[in-house]
């Protein structure tokens, strides 16, 4: 079982609740509202200010950190498919934010804090609790409407190419 609080990631025994191992995150996660995501022997956590950090699931050693160009709160669950993770950020009801695709590959195993570059990003009105569905043909994700309050009711449902981020429909 993996969890996190403040700037600490923890591996916890699911039977006893004992903390088996801890690691240090590059920052905190705004409100810690999403669970960590596991894939390919790694743990991925969305951090405040538009960051995602990858950890070795056994050692909890940092592998890389992604810093999104537009920043934002990490309010979206991280989805995994075919060697990539997908997540979105939120800046406010009236500011744009990115939905990002990141390769899970650790390009430089000698560094624990290497700066991860995105495979692609898609900019829209923000992604607030917008968990994505991903398969080999498309990424399906919802967005904010870009207006203050609940006045328009016109958020979007986007279908994106999972390899390029180009809008399909």
Question: Which residues does each predicted region cover?
Answer:
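Extracytoplasmic/lumenal domain signature
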Residues: 1-169
